[in-house]
Design a protein with these regions (language model features):
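Core catalytic alpha/beta fold that binds nucleotide/phospho-ligands
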Residues: 1-139
Length: 139
């Protein structure tokens, strides 16, 4: 399994998954794989299938139960049973999910690189900026 980080509090919880599995391996991590197989046929891109499945596996890992993710016309995700607010992000083989039972949440994950470095000052306080790149994975 590729759960890289997980953090839980009363007000929210989040996790980061590094996708290293095949679609078949990801399906095997879910309690009811058949539930997802038909939806997978809607994706033509193998990469997109992996992202989509990784989000569902991460959500299951965080909550310990399956939840259905639906999307508003704007593309914003929400859980069908409204038990949690949810935000989803993905970048180059990683997915992140944050959940809160009490308030709207947001998460964004980006692979560190020149593109992020050039715009980080627009979205982050000085104390949040990474002052020095320290390896492949910087948290």
């Amino acid at each position: 399994m590729a759960l890289l980080r997980e953090y839980k509090e009363i007000a929210y919880q989040w996790g980061i998954w590094k996708t290293e599995e095949s679609p078949e391996e990801l399906l095997a991590l879910l309690p009811d794989p058949e539930r997802y197989e038909q939806q997978l046929t809607l994706f033509s891109s193998p990469h997109r299938k992996l992202e989509w499945l990784s989000v569902r596996v991460l959500l299951y890992q965080l909550l310990g139960e399956e939840k259905t993710i639906e999307y508003a016309p704007s593309g914003k995700p929400h859980l069908a049973d409204s038990s949690y607010f949810i935000s989803i992000s993905h970048t180059r083989g990683y997915v992140a999910v944050i959940l809160s039972p009490v308030s709207e949440v947001g998460i964004d994950i980006e692979q560190y690189g020149q593109r992020v470095h050039k715009v980080a000052h627009k979205y982050m306080r000085p104390d949040e900026l990474i002052s020095e790149y320290q390896g492949e994975d910087t948290w």
